[in-house]
Amino acid sequence: MPRLPLVLLHGLWDTPRLFARLESELLERCPQLELYAPHLPHRLGAVPIRELAAQLAVLLDARFGSTHPLDLFGFSMGGVIGRTWLQEHGGHRRTSRFVVLGSPQRGTLAAQWVPRPLLAGIADMKIGSALLRQLDRRAHLLESIDCHSLYTPTDITVFPGWRAVLPRGTRRAVPVLTHRQLIVHPRAISLVADLLLSERSTAMN
């Protein structure tokens, strides 16, 4: 069965170069896999997440058309951008699998005192932010998607670490210590690749 394209969404203060190790691992195991890692400039967190999700919608439509099915992976803030695209831009209709890694789906205390007028994108990740509340109210849109959340309990960027989970799907702690290690440590890379390349029926449990 042909694999769907896999879209990789980077987080705050990062670029698609962040995924070099993961991309290498994925392509070594599955050379025919189509990977797409768009650059979403956050301007140090000043750009609201909804604006970034709208940019993502334009980029995905330009790359794949408006209906081509795909899989989605989001690291950190990228996971919240991806979820916003899924739930507010109709992405749920074309997405088979959604995997988030160290992503503040339930907010993070690290963003709690950030002023929204200066850093709206970071403020969107506050615990109880308007964006996260609205996404939770429409969480049923994720029901048809194979959802998975990976996190580390010792994360101090998404703090507390257990808040880095979607309201649907499986949840698994990754045996690394820091937020950054989630996307660069060999153990984490191997685990993420296992999940992204697994068959849907195998990954769901």
Protein language model features and the residues they cover:
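C-terminal catalytic-base region of ester-bond hydrolases, centering on the histidine
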Residues: 14, 142-205
